[in-house]
């Protein structure tokens, strides 16, 4: 009987897949201490980031049932 592969729970909480198969995740350092940050920096933190090609190589191991 073949065993199921398990998704890493930390990756499940942090990453989402776009419809085209790219991996999206949130910016770091964007959850508090906004008084000392510029408005354009705060705006940048609201937007999701896309993982680069180097990090995409790890995704099948972390999330085997992702797209």
Curated annotation (Swiss-Prot):
Q: Does the keyword Isomerase apply?
A: no
| A GO cellular component entry from the record | ribosome
Q: Provide this UniProt record's keywords sorted from A to Z.
A: Ribonucleoprotein, Ribosomal protein
Q: Name one GO biological process term.
A: translation
Pfam families to which the protein is assigned, alphabetical: Ribosomal_L35p
Q: Which GO terms describe its molecular function?
A: structural constituent of ribosome
The family database entries (HAMAP family) matched by this protein are listed as: Ribosomal_bL35
Q: Which family does it belong to?
A: Belongs to the bacterial ribosomal protein bL35 family.
Protein's name in the database: Large ribosomal subunit protein bL35
Origin organism is Brachyspira hyodysenteriae (strain ATCC 49526 / WA1)
